[in-house]
Amino acid sequence: MPRLLPVEACDLPEDYDPSVPPRTPQEYLRRVQIEAARCPDVVIAQIDPKKLRKKQTVSISLSGCQPAPDGYSPSLRWQQQQVAQFSAVRQSLHKHRGHWRSQPLDSNVTMPSTEDEESWKKFCLGERLYSDLAAALNSESQHPGIDYIKVGFPPLLSIVSRMSQATVTSVLEYLVNWFEERNFTPELGRWLYALLACLEKPLLPEAHSLIRQLARRCSQIRAGVEHKEDDRVSPLNLFICLVGRYFEQRDLADCGDPS
């Protein structure tokens, strides 16, 4: 293979020291030759498999949401209002992120590492939902007062402002996957809303897949709700609306009447 810098042998001073900065073009090119000769012909990358994400391939389902039962679908006007409010929340969060990031966390708040899925689910949802609900409720009756370890930490601005995009996407994945096998709860809803507000556009493929998965799951839960007065209907409609309207996944959005 021809050399990139075919430098012929040149006369260099006897006191030439390759460890000091070159003083002439000849010394510089000679320095490059010496460094190139020291490079191995084959380099093997040392990869830590723990740092690789479990899913190397992102599969995006093209299936849509289940249609809303009669009387459950929100109006187009309501959806537009929710999108406008959500947009304002995102702008405010972006504007004040630096301020909230600088605020100290309470002494009882320890944010898990990005890769610690189980700790994040406990952190967001609390032990009441993560583990044995009945046992946790009995424990609460013996120890009155708010115990965030049991009920979960709310998505305070001082917390979510510290989360990188990688952490936001990972925690969203943890909670959406948890939601796939369980019902909707207010604790889950608060965190999902906060994480969606933290997602930066344009969406990464992983985030794009996750929000579509979220909307479809919300439509599944909504389709099984017996009464439209159920407290879950409004937040389920909200997430379908945000995914479909704000994040422009139009095929998942409720049509809604104009009123």
From Swiss-Prot:
Keyword flag Nucleus: yes
Protein localization: Nucleus, Gem; Cytoplasm
Record GO biological process: spliceosomal complex assembly; spliceosomal snRNP assembly
Keywords annotated in UniProt: Cytoplasm, mRNA processing, mRNA splicing, Nucleus
Gene3D superfamilies associated with the record: 1.20.5.220, 1.20.58.1070
Pfam families: SIP1
Single GO cellular component term: SMN-Sm protein complex
Main localization (coarse): nucleus
Family from the record: Belongs to the gemin-2 family.
Function summary: The SMN complex catalyzes the assembly of small nuclear ribonucleoproteins (snRNPs), the building blocks of the spliceosome, and thereby plays an important role in the splicing of cellular pre-mRNAs. Most spliceosomal snRNPs contain a common set of Sm proteins SNRPB, SNRPD1, SNRPD2, SNRPD3, SNRPE, SNRPF and SNRPG that assemble in a heptameric protein ring on the Sm site of the small nuclear RNA to form the core snRNP (Sm core).
Description of how the protein assembles with itself and partners: Forms a stable heteromeric complex with survival of motor neuron protein (SMN), GEMIN3 and GEMIN4. The SMN complex is associated with the spliceosomal snRNAs U1 and U5 in the cytoplasm of oocytes.
Protein name: Gem-associated protein 2
Organism name: Xenopus laevis
Lineage: Eukaryota, Metazoa, Chordata, Craniata, Vertebrata
